[in-house]
C-alpha cells in the first residue's frame, strides 16, 4: 500500500513540475513575439545595402548591373533588393 501511495505522489509531483515548466516556456515564447520584426527589418536593410553596393561595383567595372539573386528569396532589381 505504501509503495502505491509513494508512486502516485511521485507521478503527481512530476506532472506538476512538467506542467509548470511548459507554462513558463510558453510565456517566454509569447514575450518574444515582437522581436523578430525588428530583426527582420535590420536584415532587409542589410540586404538592400549589400545588393546596391554590388550593383555599383559592377557598374564601375564597366559591366552592366546584372540582376543578381540575393539570399533568402530576394532579387537585385534597380540597385535594390526586392522580395521575390
Curated annotation (Swiss-Prot):
Keyword Disulfide bond: yes
Tagged with keyword Cell membrane: no
Transmembrane segments: none
Keywords: Disulfide bond, Neurotoxin, Postsynaptic neurotoxin, Secreted, Signal, Toxin
Propeptide: 23-47
Highest taxon listed in the record's lineage: Eukaryota
Main location group: secreted
Protein name: U4-theraphotoxin-Hhn1b
Amino acid at each position: 500500500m505504501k509503495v502505491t501511495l509513494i508512486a502516485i505522489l511521485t507521478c503527481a509531483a512530476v506532472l506538476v513540475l512538467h506542467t509548470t515548466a511548459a507554462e513558463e516556456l510558453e510565456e517566454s515564447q509569447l514575450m518574444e513575439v515582437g522581436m523578430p520584426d525588428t530583426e527582420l527589418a535590420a536584415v532587409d536593410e542589410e540586404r538592400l545595402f549589400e545588393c546596391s553596393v554590388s550593383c555599383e561595383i559592377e557598374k564601375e567595372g564597366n559591366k552592366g548591373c546584372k540582376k543578381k539573386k540575393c539570399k533568402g528569396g530576394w532579387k537585385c532589381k534597380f540597385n535594390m533588393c526586392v522580395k521575390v
